Amino acid sequence: MNTSVIRYLLGYILKLEGFLLLPPCIVAGIYYEKSGIYFLIVALISIAIGFIFSAKKPRDFTFYLKEGCATTALGWIVLSIFGCLPFYISGEIPSFTDALFETISGFTTTGASILPEVESLSYCMNFWRCFTHWIGGMGVLVFLLAIIPLSGGSNINLMRAESPGPSVGKLVPKMRHTARLLYIIYFGLTTMEIIFLLFGKMPLYDAICTSLGTAGTGGFGIKNDSFCSYNVYLQWVVTIFMILFGVNFNAYYLLLFGHIRDALKVEEVRYYFGIIIASVVVISVNIAHMCTGVFDAVTKAAFQVGSIITTTGFSSTDFDRWPELSKTLLVLLMFIGACAGSTGGGIKVSRIVIAVKTIRKELNGYIHPKSVKKLTFEHKPVDHDVIRSINVYFMTYAVIFIVSLLLVSVENYDFTTNFTAVAATFNNIGPGLSLVGPTCNFGFFNNFSKYVLMFDMLAGRLELFPLLILFHPSIWKELFIQADKKVKGNRKEKQNVRM
């Protein structure tokens, strides 16, 4: 295992985080808040440690998928630990576990909060909560790919370890240019949302924080009632942009370069919009008696469907009071999730579509045994390795979900609370139902349950396997053995120099 490049990249992640901790200092300066000093302290510490880690440049930057997964998992853990320190040392979130939970929830774009009073936080702390969504939405390692030159194979292995979905492709020949292009699209859409929100007379601070949360499909709000207090125009703007950020970014690349017909032919996106439209129609009819009219019903249904399927987690109403059909459909959307290659979480539409097509193909095999029709997706045959990887993903997903549900159930809360708490964190949604509904929070869970849910958030964001690799004994053996060899080698070199 190439431990030197893992160390080097972790150093860059810490340096990058140090600079990302500076914008909250600016916010603190604007609002004359003393809390900005804590961000500055953590930023300096993070940058200093980052320089130590990345001081010695590796001779060989080549590494394989296992190094990519290990770097990704360790990077996100380190990112979260340093990211939670401003909350903790400032005393605004006095418990380290709670501060870490809030930060992991932010970076993984989950949006599950332990805070009963969001508005009691300082402006800079609330900005940091929302900014973590934006950082984690596209992925910090994708950003690193845009600024650090690695060999082509290393680039794709690093991106595969962090990017959501069953496969990762290049938009342009060089992966470094792909990463840059993704961030250009990401930044452009975020800026557009801010502008549209300002047109609706939303305050600039609110517009920026809301857009950062929407872009990362995160869901941290700056109001205790999430989005309930905003007008209908603002709700529709956020609804549209939540759905847009749940689209596969490959489609935006095609649109950007004028390939409109090809963009409209993207199969996953067509299924994605089909699911949204069908869900909005069903829920609108189901909640019509609770609304003031058809438009009100469609507005509320569209907002919540867009929020849940994209795993954003904003709420414009207390959907925990909706009829059982609507709540069941929303829970189902939690599992489906957004498109692969988007900032959304969940299982992903592409996996669901391929799984359904696989079942249909097997059924056709029973009816027509001699049929040799191949399974296709996005107008291309699906390789057997892709089908196998999706099957393994579903099995691993089910095992982690069941084990997490059992562990959280030890506290003896009702089944709906436990089930939707795991579903909401594992799929990076945010709110669930019952005690973790849209008007509630996760603060009542004990520390053990919170760490289980933190694991779920990280596992869900990293597509399970990069995090699970850290629990494989051989990984730690390779890391420690190689580190020990390097220490002994350095000692021998020093002894030879003295002689």
Predicted segments, located by residue:
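Membrane-proximal intracellular helices of multi-pass ion channels
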Residues: 1-499
